[in-house]
From Swiss-Prot:
The modification Phosphoserine is found at S231. Residues 253-269 have a biased composition (Basic and acidic residues). Disulfide bonds join C95-C175, C412-C415. It is a multi-pass membrane protein. Gene3D superfamilies: Rhodopsin 7-helix transmembrane proteins (1.20.1070.10). GO terms for biological process: adenylate cyclase-inhibiting G protein-coupled acetylcholine receptor signaling pathway; chemical synaptic transmission; G protein-coupled acetylcholine receptor signaling pathway; G protein-coupled receptor signaling pathway, coupled to cyclic nucleotide second messenger; regulation of heart contraction; regulation of smooth muscle contraction. Residues 1-21, 80-96, 162-183, 410-417 are extracellular. It comes from the Eukaryota. Phosphorylated in response to agonist treatment. It comes from Bos taurus (Bovine). This is Muscarinic acetylcholine receptor M2.
C-alpha cells in the first residue's frame, strides 16, 4: 500500500496538469482512440463482407486501415499515458518497442498513400496496359513491400541504435528516439518521411486531375454522331427452326447465317440445337435480347447495362416463339468499348415464321447500327479520385504542423513549447481517425455498408452498392 501511495504522490508531483485537466485529456484522447478503432474496423469489415468494395484500390485502403487501427489501439493510448503522467513509467524496453511500432506503422501509412497515388496515376495515364497488370496478387505484393520496407527503415535503427553507439543517452522517465538528438538526422528524416512523399503525391494528383479533366473535355467536344457505331459486319445471326414434333431430346435443324444490312445468305450449316431459354451474365459483357411471337406491338426497354427488345405476345401457351440475342463482349477496365456482337435467332416453323424472323432481324441490325448514347465519366472513377484527394488533404493538414515544428526545432529548440509539441504529435494520430470518415463521405457504398453494420442490418449487405 505504501508503494502504491508513494507512486501516486510521485505522479501528482511530476504531472504538468491538474486533476480536472487530466480527466479532460483522458476523456478526449480515449474518445478519439475509440472512434479510430471502431472506424477502421468498419472499413476492414466492409471491404470483407461487401463484394462491391473488393477492388484493388480498396485493398490499399484496407492496408491503410490496418495501420490506422494499430495507431488507435496502441500509439494513442500509450502517448496519452505518457502525456498525463508527465514521464514514461514503463521502462526503456517498452519505450523502444512502442516507438518502433509507432514509426513503422506511420511510415507504412505514408507508403500506402504513395501506392494509392501511383496506382491511380497509372490507371489514368496508361488505361490500356496498366489494368492488365493490376491484379489482386500485384496489390498484395505492393502492400507487403510497403510494410516490409517501413519495418527495415525504422525498427532496427530505433531498437539497436544504443548498441551501435555503445551507450543509451535517453534518460530514465523519458521516451524518444535516441538518434533524434542529432539535429541533422532529425532534419533528414523529416524530409524523407514527410516532405518528399507529400511533394510526390501532390505532383501525381495534379497529373491525375489534369488527365481526368482533359478526358472529360474531350468527351464533351465529341458529338454523338461522330462516335463509332457497332459495325453490322460484326453481327452474326443464328436461326433455329425446330421440327414440328418438337419433343424434348429431339434434334432440331440449325442454320447459321450472317446478317448483313438486314439480309441473310441462303447458304446455311445445319447443327443440333437444344430448345430452352438461355441466360448469360458477366461483368465483361452487355446482353441484348429480343423475343418475337404472334406480333401485335413492339416494346423496347433500355437501361445502363442491358437492352431488351420484346416483340409481340403469345396468343396461347402452345405457340412457338422467335428469340434473338445479342451479346456484346467488352474488355476489362474502367472504360469498355464493344468488340464483338453475336445475334442468335430461334425461329418457329409456324405460319409466317420466316417473315417474323426477317422483321426482327432487321430491327436488331438497325439497332446495332445506331451509335451508343454518350455516357458520362464512370462514377466509380470519380469516387476513387475524390477519395484519394480527401485522404491526401487529411494527411497533409494533420501531419504538416508537427513536421514544421521538427524543422524549427532543428534551429531553435526553445522556440516551441511542450504543449504545442503535444498537440502537433496528436494531430498526426488524428489523421487515423479522419481517414474512415473520408471513405464514407466520398464513397456512398462505404457509407451504406457502415450504416448497415452499425445498425446490425446484415441481410444483403454483401450486395450493397
Amino acid at each position: 500500500m505504501n508503494n502504491s501511495t508513494n507512486s501516486s504522490n510521485n505522479v501528482a508531483l511530476t504531472s504538468p496538469y491538474k486533476t480536472f485537466e487530466v480527466v479532460f485529456i483522458v476523456l478526449v484522447a480515449g474518445s478519439l482512440s475509440l472512434v479510430t478503432i471502431i472506424g477502421n474496423i468498419l472499413v476492414m469489415v466492409s471491404i470483407k463482407v461487401n463484394r462491391h468494395l473488393q477492388t484493388v484500390n480498396n485493398y490499399f485502403l484496407f492496408s491503410l486501415a490496418c495501420a490506422d487501427l494499430i495507431i488507435g489501439v496502441f500509439s494513442m493510448n500509450l502517448y496519452t499515458l505518457y502525456t498525463v503522467i508527465g514521464y514514461w513509467p514503463l521502462g526503456p524496453v517498452v519505450c523502444d518497442l512502442w516507438l518502433a511500432l509507432d514509426y513503422v506503422v506511420s511510415n507504412a501509412s505514408v507508403m500506402n498513400l504513395l501506392i494509392i497515388s501511383f496506382d491511380r496515376y497509372f490507371c489514368v495515364t496508361k488505361p490500356l496496359t496498366y489494368p492488365v497488370k493490376r491484379t489482386t496478387k500485384m496489390a498484395g505484393m505492393m502492400i507487403a513491400a510497403a510494410w516490409v520496407l517501413s519495418f527495415i527503415l525504422w525498427a532496427p535503427a530505433i531498437l539497436f541504435w544504443q548498441f551501435i553507439v555503445g551507450v543509451r543517452t535517453v534518460e530514465d522517465g523519458e521516451c524518444y528516439i535516441q538518434f533524434f538528438s542529432n539535429a541533422a538526422v532529425t532534419f533528414g528524416t523529416a524530409i524523407a518521411a514527410f516532405y518528399l512523399p507529400v511533394i510526390i503525391m501532390t505532383v501525381l494528383y495534379w497529373h491525375i486531375s489534369r488527365a481526368s479533366k482533359s478526358r472529360i473535355k474531350k468527351d464533351k467536344k465529341e458529338p454523338v454522331a461522330n462516335q463509332d457505331p457497332v459495325s453490322p459486319s460484326l453481327v452474326q445471326g443464328r436461326i433455329v427452326k425446330p421440327n414440328n414434333n418438337n419433343m424434348p431430346g429431339s434434334d432440331d435443324g440449325l442454320e447459321h447465317n450472317k446478317i448483313q444490312n438486314g439480309k441473310t445468305p441462303r447458304d446455311a450449316v445445319t447443327e443440333n440445337c437444344v430448345q430452352g431459354e438461355e441466360k448469360e451474365s458477366s461483368n465483361d459483357s452487355t446482353s441484348v435480347s429480343a423475343v418475337a411471337s404472334n406480333m401485335r406491338d413492339d416494346e423496347i426497354t433500355q437501361d445502363e447495362n442491358t437492352v431488351s427488345t420484346s416483340v409481340g405476345h403469345s396468343k396461347d401457351e402452345n405457340s412457338k416463339q422467335t428469340c434473338i440475342k445479342i451479346v456484346t463482349k467488352t474488355p476489362k477496365g474502367d472504360q469498355c468499348t464493344p468488340t464483338n456482337t453475336t445475334v442468335e435467332l430461334v425461329g418457329s416453323s409456324g405460319q409466317n415464321g420466316d417473315e417474323k424472323q426477317n422483321i426482327v432481324a432487321r430491327k436488331i441490325v438497325k439497332m446495332t447500327k445506331q451509335p451508343a448514347k454518350k455516357k458520362p465519366p464512370p462514377s466509380r472513377e470519380k469516387k476513387v479520385t475524390r477519395t484519394i484527394l480527401a485522404i491526401l488533404l487529411a494527411f497533409i493538414i494533420t501531419w504538416a504542423p508537427y513536421n514544421v515544428m521538427v524543422l524549427i526545432n532543428t534551429f531553435c529548440a526553445p522556440c516551441i513549447p511542450n504543449t504545442v509539441w503535444t498537440i502537433g504529435y496528436w494531430l498526426c494520430y488524428i489523421n487515423s481517425t479522419i481517414n474512415p470518415a473520408c471513405y464514407a463521405l466520398c464513397n456512398a457504398t462505404f457509407k451504406k455498408t457502415f450504416k448497415h453494420l452499425l445498425m446490425c442490418h446484415y441481410k444483403n449487405i454483401g450486395a450493397t452498392r
